[in-house]
A protein has these predicted regions:
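N-terminal hydrophobic signal-anchor/signal peptide
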Residues: 1-63, 229
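A residue-level signal for conserved active-site and pocket-lining positions in enzyme catalytic cores
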Residues: 7, 184, 212
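Short, glycine-rich, amphipathic interfacial segments at transmembrane boundaries or analogous
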Residues: 11-15, 20-24, 82-121, 179-200
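Acyl-group handling in specialized metabolite and lipid biosynthesis
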Residues: 37, 200-203
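A hydrophobic, helix-centered structural microdomain
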Residues: 40-106, 142, 208, 214-229
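Positions in alpha-helical segments
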Residues: 55, 70, 83, 123-127, ...
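A short, structured surface patch at a secondary-structure boundary
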Residues: 115-176, 214-222
Length: 229
Protein backbone atom coordinates (compact mmCIF):
# COMPACT_ATOMS: atom_id res chain seq x y z
CA UNK A 1 0.00 0.00 0.00
CA UNK A 2 2.85 2.42 0.83
CA UNK A 3 4.29 1.77 -2.65
CA UNK A 4 0.96 2.50 -4.36
CA UNK A 5 0.64 -1.09 -5.58
CA UNK A 6 -2.50 -3.21 -5.93
CA UNK A 7 -2.54 -6.99 -5.69
CA UNK A 8 -5.21 -9.69 -5.51
CA UNK A 9 -5.59 -12.67 -3.19
CA UNK A 10 -7.66 -15.82 -3.73
CA UNK A 11 -10.23 -16.32 -0.99
CA UNK A 12 -13.68 -17.70 -0.28
CA UNK A 13 -16.43 -15.69 -2.02
CA UNK A 14 -18.90 -15.76 0.85
CA UNK A 15 -16.30 -14.62 3.38
CA UNK A 16 -15.54 -11.43 1.49
CA UNK A 17 -19.10 -10.57 0.52
CA UNK A 18 -20.11 -10.16 4.15
CA UNK A 19 -17.03 -8.08 4.88
CA UNK A 20 -17.78 -5.54 2.17
CA UNK A 21 -14.35 -6.07 0.66
CA UNK A 22 -13.89 -5.15 -3.03
CA UNK A 23 -13.45 -8.26 -5.18
CA UNK A 24 -12.72 -9.05 -8.81
CA UNK A 25 -13.89 -12.16 -10.64
CA UNK A 26 -11.33 -13.79 -12.93
CA UNK A 27 -12.69 -16.92 -14.65
CA UNK A 28 -15.34 -17.14 -11.87
CA UNK A 29 -12.57 -17.08 -9.26
CA UNK A 30 -13.12 -14.42 -6.53
CA UNK A 31 -10.00 -12.35 -5.88
CA UNK A 32 -9.78 -9.85 -3.03
CA UNK A 33 -8.38 -6.52 -4.23
CA UNK A 34 -5.85 -5.09 -1.80
CA UNK A 35 -3.50 -2.14 -2.00
CA UNK A 36 -3.45 1.60 -2.31
CA UNK A 37 -6.85 3.27 -2.75
CA UNK A 38 -6.79 6.92 -3.72
CA UNK A 39 -9.83 9.20 -3.47
CA UNK A 40 -11.13 11.10 -6.49
CA UNK A 41 -8.55 13.62 -7.83
CA UNK A 42 -10.83 16.54 -6.97
CA UNK A 43 -11.65 15.24 -3.50
CA UNK A 44 -8.94 17.10 -1.58
CA UNK A 45 -9.45 20.58 -3.12
CA UNK A 46 -13.25 20.33 -2.88
CA UNK A 47 -12.99 19.06 0.69
CA UNK A 48 -10.87 22.10 1.57
CA UNK A 49 -13.51 24.43 0.10
CA UNK A 50 -16.22 22.62 2.07
CA UNK A 51 -14.11 22.97 5.23
CA UNK A 52 -13.63 26.71 4.78
CA UNK A 53 -17.27 27.39 3.89
CA UNK A 54 -18.60 25.06 6.59
CA UNK A 55 -16.35 26.44 9.33
CA UNK A 56 -17.14 30.03 8.34
CA UNK A 57 -20.88 29.44 8.39
CA UNK A 58 -20.56 27.54 11.65
CA UNK A 59 -18.71 30.39 13.34
CA UNK A 60 -21.29 32.92 12.13
CA UNK A 61 -24.30 30.87 13.22
CA UNK A 62 -22.76 29.56 16.44
CA UNK A 63 -20.88 32.74 17.34
CA UNK A 64 -23.45 33.87 19.95
CA UNK A 65 -23.44 30.41 21.55
CA UNK A 66 -19.63 30.42 21.65
CA UNK A 67 -19.57 33.83 23.34
CA UNK A 68 -22.14 32.64 25.88
CA UNK A 69 -20.06 29.53 26.61
CA UNK A 70 -16.91 31.61 27.05
CA UNK A 71 -18.60 33.94 29.55
CA UNK A 72 -20.01 31.01 31.56
CA UNK A 73 -16.61 29.31 31.70
CA UNK A 74 -14.82 32.40 33.03
CA UNK A 75 -17.61 33.17 35.49
CA UNK A 76 -17.48 29.66 36.97
CA UNK A 77 -13.70 29.29 37.02
CA UNK A 78 -11.58 32.44 36.44
CA UNK A 79 -9.00 31.93 33.72
CA UNK A 80 -8.88 31.62 29.94
CA UNK A 81 -12.07 30.38 28.29
CA UNK A 82 -10.15 28.51 25.60
CA UNK A 83 -7.25 26.15 26.18
CA UNK A 84 -4.68 25.12 23.62
CA UNK A 85 -2.98 21.77 23.63
CA UNK A 86 -0.64 19.94 21.31
CA UNK A 87 -2.08 17.41 18.89
CA UNK A 88 -0.58 15.49 15.98
CA UNK A 89 -1.82 16.53 12.55
CA UNK A 90 -1.30 15.34 9.01
CA UNK A 91 2.11 13.77 8.34
CA UNK A 92 2.95 13.98 12.04
CA UNK A 93 2.98 17.79 12.19
CA UNK A 94 2.31 19.15 15.69
CA UNK A 95 -0.33 21.87 16.05
CA UNK A 96 -2.22 23.62 18.83
CA UNK A 97 -5.82 22.43 19.09
CA UNK A 98 -8.43 24.86 20.45
CA UNK A 99 -11.15 23.78 22.87
CA UNK A 100 -13.32 25.39 25.48
CA UNK A 101 -11.79 24.85 28.90
CA UNK A 102 -13.79 22.29 30.84
CA UNK A 103 -11.55 21.93 33.92
CA UNK A 104 -10.71 24.22 36.80
CA UNK A 105 -7.93 26.56 35.69
CA UNK A 106 -5.68 25.84 38.69
CA UNK A 107 -5.69 22.06 38.11
CA UNK A 108 -5.70 22.04 34.32
CA UNK A 109 -3.63 19.04 33.19
CA UNK A 110 -4.52 17.66 29.80
CA UNK A 111 -1.49 15.39 29.65
CA UNK A 112 -3.81 12.93 31.38
CA UNK A 113 -7.29 13.36 29.91
CA UNK A 114 -10.41 12.61 31.97
CA UNK A 115 -11.57 9.03 31.58
CA UNK A 116 -14.80 9.23 33.54
CA UNK A 117 -17.61 11.70 34.12
CA UNK A 118 -16.87 11.95 37.86
CA UNK A 119 -13.35 13.36 37.33
CA UNK A 120 -13.01 16.06 40.00
CA UNK A 121 -11.05 18.36 37.67
CA UNK A 122 -14.11 18.96 35.48
CA UNK A 123 -16.27 21.97 36.34
CA UNK A 124 -20.07 21.63 36.42
CA UNK A 125 -20.44 23.73 33.27
CA UNK A 126 -17.46 21.93 31.77
CA UNK A 127 -19.31 18.66 32.19
CA UNK A 128 -22.24 20.15 30.28
CA UNK A 129 -19.89 21.28 27.51
CA UNK A 130 -18.41 17.80 27.21
CA UNK A 131 -21.74 15.99 27.18
CA UNK A 132 -23.14 18.31 24.51
CA UNK A 133 -19.83 18.42 22.57
CA UNK A 134 -19.92 22.22 22.69
CA UNK A 135 -16.32 22.17 23.95
CA UNK A 136 -15.28 21.21 20.40
CA UNK A 137 -16.62 24.38 18.74
CA UNK A 138 -13.34 26.37 18.90
CA UNK A 139 -11.81 23.73 16.63
CA UNK A 140 -13.53 25.59 13.81
CA UNK A 141 -10.52 27.94 14.06
CA UNK A 142 -8.23 24.96 13.44
CA UNK A 143 -10.28 24.06 10.37
CA UNK A 144 -9.97 27.58 8.95
CA UNK A 145 -6.20 27.49 9.56
CA UNK A 146 -5.96 24.24 7.59
CA UNK A 147 -4.74 22.19 10.56
CA UNK A 148 -7.93 20.15 10.81
CA UNK A 149 -10.91 19.21 8.68
CA UNK A 150 -14.59 19.04 9.54
CA UNK A 151 -14.42 15.26 9.05
CA UNK A 152 -11.45 13.03 9.73
CA UNK A 153 -9.75 10.75 12.27
CA UNK A 154 -9.62 11.85 15.89
CA UNK A 155 -6.65 14.19 16.59
CA UNK A 156 -4.16 12.34 18.76
CA UNK A 157 -1.92 13.51 21.60
CA UNK A 158 1.82 13.41 20.78
CA UNK A 159 2.75 11.03 23.60
CA UNK A 160 0.22 8.50 22.27
CA UNK A 161 1.24 8.96 18.63
CA UNK A 162 4.85 8.34 19.69
CA UNK A 163 3.86 4.77 20.62
CA UNK A 164 2.32 4.03 17.20
CA UNK A 165 3.63 1.13 15.18
CA UNK A 166 4.39 1.84 11.53
CA UNK A 167 0.99 0.61 10.37
CA UNK A 168 -0.80 2.75 12.98
CA UNK A 169 0.95 5.89 11.72
CA UNK A 170 -1.20 5.69 8.61
CA UNK A 171 -3.81 7.51 10.69
CA UNK A 172 -1.59 10.55 10.21
CA UNK A 173 -1.83 10.45 6.41
CA UNK A 174 -4.90 12.72 6.46
CA UNK A 175 -5.96 15.77 8.47
CA UNK A 176 -7.68 15.02 11.79
CA UNK A 177 -11.31 16.05 12.01
CA UNK A 178 -13.78 17.61 14.42
CA UNK A 179 -16.06 14.66 13.76
CA UNK A 180 -15.63 11.23 12.23
CA UNK A 181 -16.70 7.62 12.46
CA UNK A 182 -15.30 7.31 15.98
CA UNK A 183 -17.42 10.24 17.14
CA UNK A 184 -20.71 9.05 15.63
CA UNK A 185 -20.35 5.37 16.55
CA UNK A 186 -19.77 5.56 20.27
CA UNK A 187 -16.86 7.87 21.14
CA UNK A 188 -15.55 6.90 24.60
CA UNK A 189 -17.78 3.80 24.68
CA UNK A 190 -15.49 2.24 22.07
CA UNK A 191 -12.21 0.45 22.89
CA UNK A 192 -9.04 1.88 21.35
CA UNK A 193 -8.62 -0.91 18.77
CA UNK A 194 -12.09 -0.18 17.36
CA UNK A 195 -11.26 3.53 17.14
CA UNK A 196 -8.27 2.67 14.97
CA UNK A 197 -10.34 0.35 12.79
CA UNK A 198 -12.89 3.08 12.11
CA UNK A 199 -10.15 5.60 11.32
CA UNK A 200 -8.49 3.22 8.84
CA UNK A 201 -11.85 2.44 7.25
CA UNK A 202 -12.48 6.16 6.79
CA UNK A 203 -9.05 6.77 5.26
CA UNK A 204 -9.45 3.94 2.76
CA UNK A 205 -13.01 4.90 1.79
CA UNK A 206 -13.04 8.68 2.12
CA UNK A 207 -15.20 10.60 -0.31
CA UNK A 208 -17.36 13.71 -0.33
CA UNK A 209 -20.51 11.60 -0.02
CA UNK A 210 -19.03 9.76 2.96
CA UNK A 211 -18.02 13.04 4.61
CA UNK A 212 -21.52 14.47 4.13
CA UNK A 213 -23.06 11.33 5.62
CA UNK A 214 -20.82 11.59 8.69
CA UNK A 215 -21.66 15.28 9.19
CA UNK A 216 -25.39 14.55 9.04
CA UNK A 217 -25.07 11.60 11.44
CA UNK A 218 -23.04 13.75 13.82
CA UNK A 219 -26.20 15.70 14.63
CA UNK A 220 -27.88 12.54 15.90
CA UNK A 221 -24.76 11.49 17.82
CA UNK A 222 -24.55 14.85 19.59
CA UNK A 223 -28.25 14.81 20.49
CA UNK A 224 -28.05 11.23 21.79
CA UNK A 225 -24.91 12.07 23.83
CA UNK A 226 -23.76 8.49 23.45
CA UNK A 227 -20.24 7.94 24.79
CA UNK A 228 -19.80 11.59 25.81
CA UNK A 229 -18.73 12.81 29.23
Amino acid sequence: EDLGMTFRVVTNLFEVLTAGTPIDLVDDLPLVRLGHQRPHPFYEPIKRVVDIVGASIGMILLGPAMLWCARRIVRESPGPAIFRHERVGRDGKIFQIHKFRTMYADVEDYAVAPTEASDSRITPFGRFLRVTSLDELPQLFNVLKGEMSLVGPRPEMPFIADTYDEWQRRRLSVKPGITGLWQILGRKDLPMHENLQYDFYYIRNRSLAHDLSIMVRTIGAVLSRRGAF
